């Protein structure tokens, strides 16, 4: 990989379609897989050792590193490429057969081994988080549909089986205009918005709601991210779609001191706006379902609604501060004397966020900050597309829960490994004879990898 100094720290567009042998070897040497290999050897016991566990593990990884759609294609390349066999550790030994790798994938997907594969992913992400100060500050989450086939004897499998899922797209009136159905799993992700690096993932049956996976995802992400001195955690914002708009999720984020960027679901059928709690009919301040505050000009012949000026989130008070829009923007309002009286600053309204965490988040939905931050949610969609299309998570070539969980977890390990390689890669100045520079982050990651070796 040739990365320029002007490229992003994680230059995903620089990934090679056909990685060089140097890149493959660096990635294989980077993975902290000693515990996994020890557990696999212990599971094999005194059985036949025609193909050592380390070789099977490396061949299993090569399928995803080299982006082969099937294991047969990967084995065919190993047959005709002696240099690649040397990288995989098969200088003189025979090449495994396809059924050897199929059985290995089933063993790799067993819960005790799958936990160690997930531990490799967490260690790689923790290295990145320790070296990159802003990794995990702004996070986005989403889920994706993955097609899978279940086991013929599901009662013998300890992992969840795939089932049917359905996603409907509706209009504002609630009419279904499009529906998507699939049989398989739902892939949940938490991704850093800026760097497009996956911080946590979870695989659930397709019928599982998104909100049920958020607590586990958040806990997994907080475990791999360093905790600042204030003890509040590194994550500051979490962007999600309407699937995460429920009271339990907002309460969980409030306890973790994370600002939600979640679009609200339309649940009010009859009334477009309501009075603030504690306000009677004499008040001219109302709010809509999204939590946006408005004030009414009641002096004019026809009442006129104006959007109140948002002045910020008062963290110490736990309130959202709003001000008279006429005084803030400098225009004349017929209700100025009635609302503001002798006040120079104008009428001020403070709303306690605790009144309704869904309705009044620390970053109101009708603000430019919310709009800007919420656009970062597209990062998780790009990571989902990279996982499904670039590395083939949705190829549908796996049968059984064990194999599919091993399949997806291996893809995430490769994703985390390439993220480390991209951050560690030397940067070229752009000219053919220009010097190569190693950034501070690259040196930190290199030292961490050498210390773990």
Question: What residue spans do the PLM features occupy?
Answer:
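DNA-recognition alpha helix
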Residues: 71-89
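Polybasic low-complexity intrinsically disordered regions
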Residues: 101-255, 261-265
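Short amphipathic alpha-helical "interface-anchor" segments enriched in bulky aromatics
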Residues: 78-79, 274-317, 354-403
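Basic, amphipathic alpha-helical segments enriched in Lys/Arg and hydrophobic/aromatic residues
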Residues: 372-453
């Amino acid at each position: 990989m040739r990365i320029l100094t002007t490229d992003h720290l994680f230059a995903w567009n620089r990934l090679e379609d056909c990685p060089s042998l140097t890149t493959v070897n660096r990635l294989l040497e980077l993975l902290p897989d000693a515990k996994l290999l020890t557990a696999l050897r212990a599971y094999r016991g005194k059985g036949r050792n025609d193909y050592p566990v380390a070789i099977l593990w490396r061949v299993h990884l090569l399928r995803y590193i080299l982006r082969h759609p099937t294991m047969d294609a990967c084995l065919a390349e190993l047959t005709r490429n002696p240099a690649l066999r040397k990288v995989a550790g098969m200088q003189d030994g025979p090449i495994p057969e396809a059924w050897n790798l199929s059985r290995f994938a089933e063993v790799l997907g067993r819960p005790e081994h799958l936990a160690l594969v997930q531990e490799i992913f967490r260690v790689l992400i923790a290295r990145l988080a320790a070296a990159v100060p802003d990794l995990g500050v702004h996070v986005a989450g989403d889920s994706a549909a993955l097609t899978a086939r279940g086991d013929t004897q599901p009662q013998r499998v300890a992992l969840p089986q795939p089932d049917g899922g359905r996603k409907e797209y509706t209009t504002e009136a609630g009419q279904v205009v499009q529906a998507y159905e699939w049989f398989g799993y739902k892939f949940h992700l938490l991704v850093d918005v800026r760097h497009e690096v996956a911080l946590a993932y979870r695989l659930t049956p397709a019928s599982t709601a998104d909100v049920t996976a958020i607590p586990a995802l958040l806990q997994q992400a907080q475990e791999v991210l360093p905790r600042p001195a204030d003890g509040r955690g590194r994550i500051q914002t979490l962007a999600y779609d309407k699937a995460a708009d429920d009271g339990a999720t907002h309460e969980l984020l409030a306890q973790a001191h994370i600002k939600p960027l979640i679009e609200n679901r339309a649940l009010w059928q009859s009334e477009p706006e309501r009075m603030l709690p504690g306000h009677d009919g004499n008040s001219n301040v109302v709010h809509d379902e999204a939590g946006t505050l408005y004030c009414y000009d009641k002096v004019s012949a026809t009442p006129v609604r104006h959007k109140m000026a948002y002045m910020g989130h008062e963290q110490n008070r736990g309130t959202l501060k709003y001000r008279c829009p006429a005084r803030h923007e400098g225009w004349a309002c017929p209700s100025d004397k009635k609302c503001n009286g002798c006040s120079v600053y104008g009428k001020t309204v403070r709303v306690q966020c605790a009144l309704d965490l869904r309705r009044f988040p620390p970053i109101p939905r009708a603000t430019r900050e919310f709009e800007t931050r919420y656009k970062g949610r597209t990062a998780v969609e790009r990571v989902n597309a990279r996982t499904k299309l670039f590395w083939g998570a949705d190829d549908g070539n796996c049968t059984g829960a064990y194999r599919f969980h091993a399949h997806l977890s291996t893809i995430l390990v490769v994703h985390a490994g390439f993220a480390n390689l991209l951050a560690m890669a030397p940067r070229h100045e752009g000219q053919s004879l220009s010097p190569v520079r190693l950034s501070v982050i690259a040196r930190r990651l290199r030292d961490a990898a050498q210390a773990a070796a």
